[in-house]
Amino acid sequence: MLEEFGNVIAPGGAGVVIASQSGHGLGALTAEEDASLAMTPADELLGLPMVQPDQVRDSMYAYQLSKRANALRVMAEAVRWGKRGARVNTISPGIIFTPMAKDEMTGSGGESYRRMIELCPAGRGGTPDEVGTVGALLMGPDGGFITGSDFLMDGGLTAAYRFGELAP
């Protein structure tokens, strides 16, 4: 679908795709894997060796890989959109207090979510309005120089997983 929008986007247009903080939780991929996820036509993605059942460890890995692919595909697509005078970016939110997140907080994984929030630098989850504010920046004239970028807005959760108390 992203490619189709790229075919019709008007000069001066902008787009935002929601990815996820989870894509940042995936370990490093090779340059070849990044390029494959970014550039393979959408209808051929399931043929990539890296997404074959024997390569996908579990459902979390599959989810993280799909979110990483979202951000990489937008980055690659930004090159094409730029030729039309348009921009496209991703936002990768962490725990945002939507109705779904509130359900997850009270479900079986609730303790894990509460621990992540407690140990992330911001000490709280985000709000839909905060995501909307970043989206408005990216879509509006103040974001005119921003394209092909992924905005990680997770209250520092990824930092805590890499360098803080949530690090392995």
Located regions from the model:
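C-terminal helical subdomain
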Residues: 5, 55, 62-63, 68-71, ...
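SDR active-site lid
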Residues: 86, 95-103, 107-122
